[in-house]
């Protein structure tokens, strides 16, 4: 399937190229902004809502009064009287059966939304540009595998069709009937209460046929399920991007396709059928980033690539890792060896001393004589300061004996 060419082929009612070509309008090259399309769709869809509200009297059409305190029941207003189940039941409150709702809805809610005209046009331009890309159209679920070209343009003769069988034959010749068969297969019953409100069945969307003049084309196509018909001067974002998602499959008549440049203009001239409107421009004229980065202007401003790879090395604890410690301190191995030898030598000395002490204990002759303990008045061993004090007089006596000379020992005359 061909797409995004400067020239678009025009197909006849037989499904073959008629030989005529149309220049691709500039609107199909507009920037695709799904965010703007979704925002505009959401706000415009709100304008179709019908105001609704509950009755102002709902929940208040009874006589009720609170019983007050002291009755071991809630202070909610209660229905008066007796003789029925209703008497004594709570009323008015949103937590009561038969009471009003919380914040009853009002019809003066802000139902409608105003959207800027330029923003609406931007959304339509994005939706049209997306309809020319097969990938986006197929992602939306349209069966366009056999369609010869996108965007698909047919001759103006189609605008004069008045019979549905002619429209069906055209779709089959253009290989677009697969999209209609998808719609038939998707018809099903709606879930929810819409079944009771004249909205029983739902189905998928089919092609969108866009024409310039209605010479019977609306009557011919309107009864085919899934088909949407739009006049090129009244394009609607709700139809071009159902659900706020771009990528609708569009079939154009030749005159409608040629009119797009007058409606939306190009980047060289403004739109002639709209006042003061210019086609939105891309923020990037060239979206090929690889081509931009490889351009000589960019390459001149860039530094040369660093081809040396600096890998992060895991830091290891040298106190736990001997190999790292030897890198930092080669003498650590000798220190560790000396420590081991010293510990072995000290252990050997301790063992020898313990053996000698054990041998001395086992031999009683060689055992040294024990000193007699100092005994007090009550024949109990004296400990601490008392023992030291008891020993001092003996020492003083010995010192006095030593100081006494031979002259002291002479007898008295």
Swiss-Prot record:
A GO term from the CC aspect: cytoplasm
Gene assigned in the entry: RPL4
Assembly with partners or alone: Component of the large ribosomal subunit. May bind IPO9 with low affinity. Interacts with RBM3.
Record localization: Cytoplasm
Residues with the Citrulline modification: 300
Family indicated by similarity: Belongs to the universal ribosomal protein uL4 family.
One of the GO BP terms on file: translation
Origin species: Oryctolagus cuniculus (Rabbit)
Record field: compositional bias (Basic residues): 370-383
UniProt modified residues of type Omega-N-methylarginine: 97
Name this protein carries in UniProt: Large ribosomal subunit protein uL4
Processing after translation: Citrullinated by PADI4.
